[in-house]
């Protein structure tokens, strides 16, 4: 069918993004507290009261916009990341680096670190997208890469308070945690939005938002 053919064409251009960063917890909140000399609790307090570095990971989505592996995603997906790995079409994994980021618009540009050629998608004219138009979202919700959902544009010019940029497309296509940074396609297979967030953290409630 039409949706299956369009999805098959677009899937190689959508990437899963995973990031890791080192998190250092707050230091001991009672730095001047001391146990009596020889107390059996002294060593235990030192062991458990000292902050321990740990690795934190996050998931997101993105899409390729040229054959050399330039990827567009949300800035909050990669912000603070020390290592970024992108998986293309659910198969090969590559390292990537940030080559541009803007916190105001919450957009980041990545470069996949390889000489391989990729299949890009192109941007459409989001200004022409109308309420009621069919759309497709492809992304990595909850780590389930290559997930495709569809719906319609429910509203335009929405404000959701995530950033100073307030002109979101609202859609009822399911968008969950991990979809952030992924593309919203029109029926021509052009990107008309970057899926950003959902209203409510427990899962999709029919209110997905996309930055045009």
Over which residues does each language-model region extend?
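Serine-dependent protease modules
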Residues: 1-212
């Amino acid at each position: 069918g039409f949706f299956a053919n369009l999805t098959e064409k677009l899937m190689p251009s959508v990437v899963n993004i995973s990031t890791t960063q080192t998190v250092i917890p707050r230091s001991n909140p009672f730095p001047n507290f001391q146990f009596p000399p020889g107390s059996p609790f002294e060593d235990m307090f030192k062991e458990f009261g000292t902050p321990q570095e740990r690795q934190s990971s996050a998931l997101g989505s993105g899409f390729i916009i040229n054959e050399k592996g330039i990827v567009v995603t949300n800035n909050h997906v990669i912000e603070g990341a020390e290592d970024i790995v992108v998986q293309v079409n659910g198969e090969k994994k590559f390292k990537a680096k940030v080559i541009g980021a803007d916190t105001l618009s919450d957009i980041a540009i990545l470069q996949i670190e390889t000489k391989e050629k990729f299949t890009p998608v192109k941007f459409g004219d989001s200004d022409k997208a109308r309420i009621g138009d069919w759309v497709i979202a492809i992304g990595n919700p909850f780590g389930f890469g290559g997930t495709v959902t569809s719906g319609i544009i429910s509203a335009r010019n929405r404000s959701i308070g995530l950033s100073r940029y307030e002109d979101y497309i609202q859609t009822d296509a399911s968008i969950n945690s991990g979809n952030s940074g992924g593309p919203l396609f029109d029926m021509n297979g052009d990107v008309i939005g970057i899926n950003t967030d959902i209203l409510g953290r427990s899962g999709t409630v029919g209110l997905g938002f996309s930055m045009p």
